[in-house]
């Protein structure tokens, strides 16, 4: 069994991390931590079994985060705090010798993320640090990746589209740190990073990575500042071009969709379906559609993290470097838009 602690008591920690931890047979939840005692107690009450609580306010002997990290029966932590707090928790836990599963995005910007990755890489035999990008564990996306590899061919073009609306009454918007974001991009960073990670996964399936971007952004709903919409042209390392259109500020709601067009066929992915159009050697097209029951992949990513610890072998889908590359692409989009569509390189090292 792997003793684990949950750091953070927000919505996603309560509704996703806690049940995921409790569903993985080799994980044993030992403790929870939040900055406030009240939040820590509230989270602990939701746990299936009794867990210890730790907090920093009010200061209480034996109940701080440092006290939690000093426990020898806790081998790992799941860090699910606000975007600006995450880097501090990651460093602190790794320095204490704990394996870490930290929520996406890896950090608020690439400078902070690169600093973390470089520091981690310089450590001698460090604990496992995994970044929780749960979309990489979505069953339909994994199937789309497999089909893209099977179809093969060279990339011709690609498309990512999502249109939706984050309303003022949305439970995630109601959190103070999202109402007044002190990080770039607002919901485009907080939620859009999932879409970017999914696009990169499918581009990698045809041997491509984004290289350059040109983007424009807008703010359609004032409460979603600084920006809620981005439209971009993205070029890959082999000079293939595609588009990225993401908005959290439009009433019209469309499903998330990624289309990969190669010289051998087309893959269209949504979270609940994968459509394959395969061009045969004779020139005929064969269509196939496979449907899925939606699963956000959170349980699967905790299972992968647990196995990584037990086998002492990090899962590449949770690599901090992959998370850094996700962030680098998104930051390049935002940076280009801030410069009225000027071309930006996707820098991640």
Swiss-Prot record:
Its EC number is 1.1.1.-. One of its GO terms (molecular function) is nucleotide binding. SUPFAM superfamilies: Glyceraldehyde-3-phosphate dehydrogenase-like, C-terminal domain (SSF55347), NAD(P)-binding Rossmann-fold domains (SSF51735). The keyword GTP-binding does not apply. One of its GO terms (cellular component) is cytoplasm. The keyword NADP applies. Signal peptide: none annotated. InterPro entries: Gfo/Idh/MocA-like_OxRdtase_C, Gfo/Idh/MocA-like_OxRdtase_N, NAD(P)-bd_dom_sf. GO terms for biological process: NADPH regeneration. Induction: Expression is induced in the presence of 6mM glutamine. Keywords: NAD, NADP, Oxidoreductase. Pathway: Secondary metabolite biosynthesis. Dehydrogenase; part of the gene cluster that mediates the biosynthesis of the gamma-pyrones fusapyrone (FPY) and deoxyfusapyrone (dFPY). FPY is an undecaketide and thus likely synthesized by the polyketide synthase FPY1 from acetyl-CoA functioning as starter unit and the addition of 10 malonyl-CoA extender units by successive Claisen-condensations. Belongs to the Gfo/Idh/MocA family. PANTHER family: NAD(P)-BINDING ROSSMANN-FOLD SUPERFAMILY PROTEIN (PTHR42840:SF5), NAD(P)-BINDING ROSSMANN-FOLD SUPERFAMILY PROTEIN-RELATED (PTHR42840). This is Dehydrogenase FPY6. It comes from Fusarium mangiferae (Mango malformation disease fungus).
């Amino acid at each position: 069994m792997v003793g684990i602690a949950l750091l953070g008591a927000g919505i996603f920690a309560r509704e996703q991390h806690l049940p995921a931890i409790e569903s993985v047979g080799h994980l044993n939840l030992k403790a929870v931590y939040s900055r406030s005692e009240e939040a820590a107690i509230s989270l602990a009450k939701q746990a299936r079994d009794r867990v210890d609580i730790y907090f920093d306010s009010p200061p209480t002997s034996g109940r701080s985060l440092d006290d939690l990290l000093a426990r020898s029966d806790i081998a790992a932590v799941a860090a699910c705090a606000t975007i600006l707090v995450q880097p501090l928790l990651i460093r602190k836990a790794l320095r204490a010798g704990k394996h870490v599963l930290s929520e996406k995005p890896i950090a608020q910007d690439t400078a902070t993320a690169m600093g973390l990755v470089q520091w981690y890489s310089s450590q001698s035999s460090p604990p496992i640090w995994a970044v929780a990008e749960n979309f990489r564990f979505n069953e339909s996306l994994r199937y789309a990746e497999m089909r893209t590899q099977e179809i093969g061919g060279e990339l011709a073009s690609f498309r990512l589209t999502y249109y939706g609306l984050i309303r003022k009454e949305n439970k995630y918007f109601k959190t103070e740190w999202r109402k007044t974001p002190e990080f770039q991009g607002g919901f485009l960073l907080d939620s859009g990073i999932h879409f970017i990670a999914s696009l990169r996964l499918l581009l990698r399936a045809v041997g491509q990575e984004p290289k350059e971007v040109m983007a424009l952004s807008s703010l359609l709903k004032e409460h979603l500042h600084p920006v809620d919409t981005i439209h971009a042209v993205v070029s890959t390392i082999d000079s293939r071009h595609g588009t990225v259109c993401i908005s959290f500020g439009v009433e019209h709601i469309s499903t998330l969709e990624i289309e990969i067009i190669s010289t051998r066929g087309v893959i269209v992915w949504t979270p609940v379906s994968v459509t394959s159009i395969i061009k045969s050697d004779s020139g005929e097209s064969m269509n196939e559609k496979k449907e899925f029951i939606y699963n956000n992949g959170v349980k699967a990513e905790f299972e992968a993290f647990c196995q990584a610890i037990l086998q002492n072998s990090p899962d590449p889908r949770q690599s901090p470097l992959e998370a850094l590359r996700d962030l680098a692409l998104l930051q390049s989009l935002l940076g280009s838009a801030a410069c009225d569509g000027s071309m930006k390189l996707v820098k991640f090292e």
